[in-house]
Amino acid sequence: MGQFTVVSLGLLAVFLSLSGAKGDNCPANWISRNGVCNKLFPDRKTWLEAEMYCRALKPGCHLASLHRDSDSTVLAWYISDHFKGAGHVWIGLRDTNRKRTWKWSDRTSTNYFSWNQGEPNNVQDNENCVHPWAPSGYLKWNDEPCASLHPFICQYKL
């Protein structure tokens, strides 16, 4: 009877891990945040190249979208703690029509902004993509030309 119990518990553990039991099931090297998985990629890409890279990883994966202060804080900590010297990092916010109408690449609601003072400033009418600003500890955002090369954060929902 004891051996049966051990085997049964072992099979239950395997089943739960494979079936996505309640909890955070982000892959190794990804972090969990409010029901999504995030990973910073150190490769420097344009905003569009980064978005296409994220989309190719997994259905529903995009550059990260942030919807509250806690989202910004978690990602700022992650970038600062694990990727010192990464510089600016692309997130999924962009002004696709160049009319100062900001939208997330995953099409979630644009209900939260964390602009650095004086931003967005659209220098030379060419800053249509967004990154957390390194000098702010990645807590405040800056608009920048989409052709700039930066590391980036991909995100998908659990």
Curated annotation (Swiss-Prot):
Keywords: Calcium, Disulfide bond, Hemagglutinin, Lectin, Metal-binding, Secreted, Signal, Toxin. InterPro entries: C-type_lectin-like, C-type_lectin-like/link_sf, C-type_lectin/snaclec_domain, C-type_lectin_CS, CTDL_fold. One of its GO terms (molecular function) is toxin activity. The keyword Plastid does not apply. A motif (Mannose-binding) lies at residues 119-121. Transmembrane segments: none annotated. Residues 33-155 form the C-type lectin domain. It is found in: Secreted. Mannose-binding lectin which recognizes specific carbohydrate structures and agglutinates a variety of animal cells by binding to cell-surface glycoproteins and glycolipids. May be a calcium-dependent lectin. Belongs to the true venom lectin family. PANTHER family: MANNOSE, PHOSPHOLIPASE, LECTIN RECEPTOR RELATED. This is C-type lectin lectoxin-Enh7. It comes from Pseudoferania polylepis (Macleay's water snake).
